């Protein structure tokens, strides 16, 4: 088996595992505000062979965290693409966690996982409030969307996008130009955060 074919098979297996783990189970029901972001028609994460795919994973296989516990993310695309990662908590408060102050470029190489935080670096993302936290992973072959160029204000690590997810979802879709010559893909994970 050639190295290229082996890499494609490995990515497909990783994507299938991520899709199986990335579903929202009964115990991880999204709020209406989170569901709006999860339902954006950006593009499937499992497009036919040759299409852009994005897979996100976390360091806890069961997707369960305690408040204050660090969350380590990994993201991978099957072709060079611009990537954004959104975190949406239960009340709809949405944060752009990638790109961020430490990682200003949204461009990822094909089949090279990005780890947040970098190995050996201090934690960047923590489980903040009890309930379900949604992570939405977005990729596009064009990088002209504001989603890939947004800079955090002041000394913050991340950009806060507000709580009006319906307006935000519409703005994201318009900015990505979904269906107008740009390949796009999305996937998501729902995490359970416990307060005890």
Regions found by a protein language model. Give the residues of each.
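Bacterial N-terminal signal peptides that target proteins for export
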Residues: 1-10
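General helical structural elements
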Residues: 9-12, 170
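Hydrophobic h-region of N-terminal signal peptides that target proteins for export
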Residues: 13-22
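Secretory-pathway glycoprotein ectodomains that are cysteine- and/or Ser/Thr/Pro-rich
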Residues: 21-196
